Structures are given as C-alpha cells and as structure tokens.
C-alpha cells in the first residue's frame, strides 16, 4: 500500500507539472507575441543616424576657406597665397555614420521636414560622405534598410553659411556663385550658376560632374581663337560672344569702357535672363578676371554687396589656376593692383547710380543702370533677379 500511494502521488505530481507547463507554454506564446511586437517597435529605432547629431551645424568649407571668410576684408586672401600648394579651396564632405549592422541601407536627405523630394545616397557601409549639399541650408535626414523597410527617426542638421566651392576633375578655381545674401535680405540660389577655369581638359570624373549637375549652358568668355566646345557632345549650349570676349576684372573699369569687351559682357548677361539656360557654367582661361567680372555684375545686379563680391573674386587665389600668371614674390604688388581694380569697378558702377540722383545710391542700382544703357532690358533684369533670388 505504501508503494502504491507513493506512485499515485508521483503520478499526480507529474500530471500537475505537465498541466502547469502547458499553461506556461500558452503564456510564453503570448509573451513571444508581445516580445515580437516590442522587437518590431525597437527595430524601427534599431537603425539610427549617429552623426551628424540632432540640430548640428556642419561646415562645407575647409579650414583655410573658413579662415579667409572669418572677419573678411578686401585683400585678406593675399595673405594666404602659396603657389606651390595648388588647389586649396576644395570643400569638406559631410560625414554620416549609422547603427544597424550590415545591409543594403540608403541615406535620405531632404530640405523638407516631411522628407519629400529627398535625395538618396548609398549607405551600405556604416560611414558615408556626402559632398553635394548647399551652404547655409536646413536639412533633414533618415536612413532606411532597403530590404526590410526598417527606418530611422528623422534628424535635423544645418550647413554653415559661406562660399560653396566645388571640385571638378581636370580644371581649377571652381565654385557656385550662390549662397550670398543680398542687401534686401534675400539669398542667391545655389546649384544654378557655377564659375571656374576652362574645361578644355576635363577628366572622366570632371565630365561626369557636368552631367550630374545638369549643366545646360557654358559661357566661354575668352577671345574667339581660344574657345573650345569640348562638351558639346553632352548637348550643352554655347552662346556666341563677340570675338574679343568679355571685360576683365583686373583692369577695373578700363575694360568695361572698351566697346568690344562691353558688348561681350552684355551678351553674357542676357544669357542669365532665360530660365531655360540654367544651370550655367561660365569661365575664361583661368577663371579669375573675366570670369570674376561677370560674377561681380550678376551677383551685384541681384543685390550682393561689394565686400562679398570681392571675397568671391579673391577665392581664386586659393586655386592653382588663379595664381598661374604671377610669381610668389609679386604677391604684394598684385595686392595693390587688386585694390585699384576692385575699387575702380565699384566706383564706375556707383557713378551710374549717382547719375540717377536717387536718395540712396547703391551698387545694385548702378549695375542696373549700366546694363540698361547698354542694351539689357528691364524685363531681362527682372527675370535674372527672379530666377536667382526669387525677387518679384
């Protein structure tokens, strides 16, 4: 009897144990379901952008350009000229890093908080760099796993205001003329107009740059025998300028007084009045003086002030091409000539504004009056301003 009681007790205990396990199994199943739900919620946040941090401000300017821009005054760039070092203006990329392990990830960057019109970049590596952002701009970013749909939270960052330099293989002295603020509180749009040296010997990468940025028009400011239409196979338009080419910044207002050079300048300015011509790349031989003159006139016309216009010109001296035609020992004399040239150009346009007898003469009004007297129409000027700044 004692043995049968013991066996009965053991059997009952086993039955209770199995029943308990069965019930526990049911709870475990529910727990797994809840856990999966929690994992799914965690997974959405399992991939995150580590850098840039939320609300970070990043600079697209390298340290040298930052130093020039800080507390800039006309002539400052001459203190940094070093011909032996070649191009030193190249932009900094924005570095992004993420969590999430290996996989087919995509980085999305948009200027809209709802991530509409986002540009997509490969983010398969845990670190990637982006080099085609605008300066002085608010951005939003997120990362998504292309296979699972796993997506990070949206993160905000801004880029610092300043010149937007670009790197184009096979040429030099290249940058966007946008990003500058006007006296009216507007900002010149970026991605529409680029300036630089001649594109006669571009690398394959340089040619890809023109494709990537969708350049539709190239304005060659050189004299006729020097002009080469090396990218016409890409369907790029080359407007015809007078044989003598365009006015030259380094000669101040003297070249603008030259009838043929003035005609070249006016012809080039008119190209900017037609929205179908954008994006535009304009150049001379080394991208400094004739190119600098046109940049001065276009940005001055939309309201950029003299100091920023001279900064844009002086950035040429951080490039290989911008220093080709003088020796390092001649830097000081070049600096003095530069002062005379820039002030001569400024004074010439201010005379046009003063001649209108307005209460507050300005460079913007002076350039406008100069252009009107030489064949550019009111409608063309209005169009240029609207295209480049949104001014109505």
Language model: regions and residue ranges:
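Bacterial N-terminal signal peptides that target proteins for export
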Residues: 1-10
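C-terminal motif of bacterial Sec signal peptides marking the signal peptidase cleavage site
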Residues: 17-20
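Cys-dependent protein tyrosine phosphatase-like superfamily
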Residues: 22-281, 294-392
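Ser/Thr-glycine-rich phosphate-binding loops at phosphate-binding pockets of nucleotides
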Residues: 286, 290-291
């Amino acid at each position: 009897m004692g043995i049968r009681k013991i066996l009965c007790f053991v059997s009952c205990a086993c039955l209770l144990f199995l029943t308990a396990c069965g019930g526990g199994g049911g709870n475990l199943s529910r727990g797994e379901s809840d856990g999966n739900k929690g994992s799914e919620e965690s997974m959405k946040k399992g991939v995150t952008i580590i850098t840039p941090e939320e609300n970070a401000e990043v600079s697209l300017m390298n340290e040298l350009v930052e130093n020039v821009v800080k507390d800039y005054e006309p002539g400052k760039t001459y203190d940094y000229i070093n011909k032996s070092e070649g191009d030193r203006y190249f932009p900094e990329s924005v570095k992004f890093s993420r969590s999430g392990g290996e996989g087919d990830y995509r980085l999305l960057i948009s200027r809209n908080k709802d991530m509409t019109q986002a540009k997509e970049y490969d983010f398969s590596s845990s670190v990637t760099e982006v080099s085609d952002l605008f300066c002085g701009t608010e951005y939003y970013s997120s990362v998504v796993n292309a296979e699972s749909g796993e997506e990070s939270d949206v993160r905000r960052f801004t880029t610092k205001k300043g010149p937007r330099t670009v790197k184009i293989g096979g040429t030099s002295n290249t940058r966007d003329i946008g990003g500058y603020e006007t006296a009216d509180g507007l900002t010149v749009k970026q991605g529409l107009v680029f300036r630089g040296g001649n594109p006669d010997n571009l690398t394959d990468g340089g040619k890809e740059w023109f494709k990537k940025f969708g350049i539709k028009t190239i304005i060659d400011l050189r004299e006729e025998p020097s002009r080469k239409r090396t990218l016409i196979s890409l369907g790029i338009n080359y407007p015809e300028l007078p044989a003598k080419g365009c006015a030259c910044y380094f000669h101040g207002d003297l070249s603008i007084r030259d009838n043929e050079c003035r005609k070249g300048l006016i012809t080039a300015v008119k190209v900017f009045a037609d929205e179908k011509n954008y994006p535009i790349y304009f150049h001379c031989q080394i991208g400094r003086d004739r190119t600098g003159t046109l940049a001065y006139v276009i940005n001055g016309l939309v309201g950029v002030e003299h100091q920023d216009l001279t900064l844009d010109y002086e950035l040429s001296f951080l490039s290989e091409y911008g220093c080709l035609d003088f020796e390092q020992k001649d830097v000081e004399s070049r600096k003095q000539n530069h002062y005379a040239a820039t002030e001569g150009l400024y004074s010439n346009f201010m005379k046009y504004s003063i001649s209108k007898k307005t209460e507050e003469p300005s460079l913007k009004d002076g350039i406008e009056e100069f252009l009107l007297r030489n064949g550019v129409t009111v409608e063309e000027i209005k169009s240029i301003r609207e295209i480049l700044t949104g001014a109505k």
